[in-house]
Design a protein with these regions (language model features):
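Short beta-strand/turn micro-motifs composed of small residues
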Residues: 6-7, 65
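Short strand->helix junction
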Residues: 10, 38-39, 112, 153
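A glycine/threonine-rich phosphate-anchoring loop and its flanking beta-alpha core
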Residues: 82-173
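Cofactor-binding loop segments of dinucleotide-utilizing enzymes, especially the Rossmann-like FAD-
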Residues: 7-8, 36, 107-109
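Short, small-residue-rich loop/turn micro-motifs
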Residues: 9, 28, 38, 148, ...
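N-terminal, positively charged, Ser/Thr/Ala/Gly-biased leader segments
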Residues: 1-4
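N-terminal small/polar loop signature for handling phosphorylated ligands or for N-terminal nucleophile
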Residues: 12, 16-84
């Protein structure tokens, strides 16, 4: 089996991704790294991820990061197993996908929007200049590993920002 490892460049820079890569190596799990993840993931991030996943020959996804990495992984996993939704814009709202996403293991590094356990994810439509809220019970990660050590490894400023993000989401509802 091969992992498709979705994370962002900051987690690579902070050395957090290296810890997961070390676990892959210790367990002889081949992986493909995908780090084209923006702070607010875009349609292009998902589309590029779908192409990279298909080219990699991976069997499952490991998403390390905050909501952005996990949301990107959710979008990739849904589109790969539901090719009728290759136009990522078609995922906006309540998507009528037929198949569960690629099995995904979510490793959150922030305590923000709980992307690792919800049916929601957000993708930015840069052309329309708007957030697409996507709702799909088929996109929930198969496994969520909430390790406080991952959260402690984040800069305090980022931890505070994700707390404010969670508060903002709660107020918006």
């Amino acid at each position: 089996k091969k992992a498709f490892f979705v994370t962002d460049k900051d987690l690579i820079k902070f050395g957090v991704a290296a810890e997961i890569i070390k676990v892959f190596g210790e367990n002889q799990i081949p992986y493909e790294l995908y780090s084209d993840v923006k702070a607010n993931p875009t349609i292009a991030n998902v589309q590029n991820g779908v192409a990279a996943y298909k080219a990699s020959g991976a069997d499952f996804i490991v998403a390390l990061g905050g909501g952005s990495s996990i949301d990107t992984a959710k979008g990739i996993g849904i589109v790969v197993n539901n090719p009728d939704f290759a136009d990522v814009k078609s995922l906006e709202g309540v998507a009528d996908t037929k198949h569960k996403a690629v099995p995904t293991f979510a490793l959150p590094t922030t305590a923000g929007t709980a992307a690792e356990v919800t049916i929601n994810y957000v993708i930015i439509d840069e052309d329309a200049r708007k957030k697409m809220v996507c709702v799909d019970p088929n996109d929930i990660p198969a496994v969520a590993i909430v390790d406080p050590e991952l959260m402690y490894s984040m800069p305090k400023r980022l931890t505070a920002a994700t707390g404010m993000d969670a508060l903002t989401h709660a107020i918006e509802i």
